[in-house]
């Protein structure tokens, strides 16, 4: 929510400060499952190993959404580094700043045998 608290330029898009997101446990569960899948199966993608999209995974977890977005990251060892990377990336920044999103669930998972070691997922939703 700190990133949303002030106006931002995300690539060529300008965003006003956005309202804080509300934590959603269902989105957090879906985010944790995706992070764990990426870590344990050593891949990095918005689609899971079964080809499910973020919207598919949110629905499977029980989240009924009008709008879903997702940011993923890998290898960063702190939340600050992850968010800084997302703010610097136009598409990820646009998800963070999108005023239509109302809820957030996020998680990370670690597998030292994977290429990146740690995998992060943030899921944004509008019920």
Show the residue positions of the predicted features:
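Short, surface-exposed glycine/acidic/tryptophan-bearing loops
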Residues: 25-77
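Short glycine-/small-residue-rich flexible loop motifs, especially phosphate/cofactor-binding loops
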Residues: 1, 55, 93
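Disulfide-stabilized extracellular recognition modules
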Residues: 65, 69, 73-127
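A short alpha-helix/helix-coil micro-patch that ends at or immediately precedes a cysteine
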Residues: 1-40
């Amino acid at each position: 929510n700190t990133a949303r608290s002030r106006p931002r330029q995300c690539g060529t898009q300008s965003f006003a400060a956005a309202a804080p997101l509300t934590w959603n446990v269902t989105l957090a569960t879906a985010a944790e499952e995706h992070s764990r899948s990426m870590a344990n199966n050593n891949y990095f993608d918005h689609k899971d190993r079964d080809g499910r999209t973020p919207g598919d995974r949110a629905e499977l977890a029980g989240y009924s959404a009008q709008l879903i977005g997702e940011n993923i990251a890998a290898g960063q060892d702190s939340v600050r580094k992850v968010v800084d990377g997302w703010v610097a990336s136009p598409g990820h920044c646009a998800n963070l700043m999108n005023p239509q999103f109302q809820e957030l669930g996020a998680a990370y998972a670690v597998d030292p045998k994977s290429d990146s070691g740690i995998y992060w997922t943030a899921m944004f939703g509008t019920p």
